[in-house]
Amino acid sequence: MGFAEFAGNQRVVTALQGMLTADRVPHAMLFSGPRGVGKYTLAVMFAQAANCARRKDDFCGECEPCRRIGLLAEPAPLVEQGLAQRGESADAAMVERVPLILQTHPDVWSIVPDPMRLRNPVARPVLHMGQLRAVARAANFKPTARRRVFILDGAETMRWDLANIFLKILEEPPESATLILLAPNPYLLLSTIRSRCLQFYFAPLSTEQLEEILKRRTQFKPSERKLAAQLAEGSPGRAMHMDLEGAAQLRRDVLQVLERAVEGRSYAQLFDATAQLVKGQKESFENVLEVFYIVITDLLELAYGSTDRPLRDPALRQELGAVCKKIDLEWVAQAVDGLDELHGRLRRNINRQLGLDAVAISLARR
């Protein structure tokens, strides 16, 4: 056990170990990079190393602090447990009074966006005021072990008017506490928060690195490992947990929307395709948009790229080739701009169906 188990981004691991060895741990860090690249995993590992009873610059994984903190590595069951304890009928006031906090050790908290949707079924999970206030209070408590660590996953989801609560912690940092913010894009956070954090960017892994990880940690066949590595966009977490059959269906559904748009089908047929895509997928809407980017990248590569460069999804080469004959660079640019705008508006809890319909209409050939 230890940091040696972490795959990729060794420069970040080395920097964290150096901090622990020198006993110069910052009061706040910001981990940014693609979803599933290992930000949360390494944050939990750091919390283990900061409180390990046997080691100083690493963690053993066997002592009581390591084992208890390690339970945070799989947050989904803890989230379900927390929601069940709070009750399904919780109103907005209850959500603030009983904030969702994942805690398996007194000194380490994991704060994740609260999935309680209340009366809005399309609302994105966000960090709530109650969660931030709880962190502000607890950060000043003395640790029972060596260091208090607060992991804020999805830090970009906190409303900017609530960020001032968090900013006060950064302006008056406790001596024995470290806050680790996780966000896909650091610029989704206020500049005043970014400037007070030591920032680390987690780069996507290469396809070869992902295939090696999948070979060691999954039961995927060689062909499945290759496909998962190509579609994971450098994310080991996404590759290891990929439902290949579901991912294949999602890509077909996305391609169907683009096919109907470029073929000039009726708006009724186009909207049927977008409705099927939004309602029929178990994945997050953000992931659906990412698949749009992947398919469009393959279209661009097939139409204008090198012929010997592999597609991300070679199984759809024939269908992609048919679409390529009906598009140009202007269409590709318009598609990317529309997806970028839709992705940016997700923070405002817009209607996803209407947003995707608008993008599809803008791409329709008439």
Residue ranges and their predicted role:
Residues 160-164, 286:
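Conserved strand-to-helix beginnings and helix N-cap segments that scaffold or border functional pockets
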Residues 1-49, 53-57, 65-68, 98, ...:
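Charged, glycine-rich active-site and insertion segments that engage polyanionic ligands
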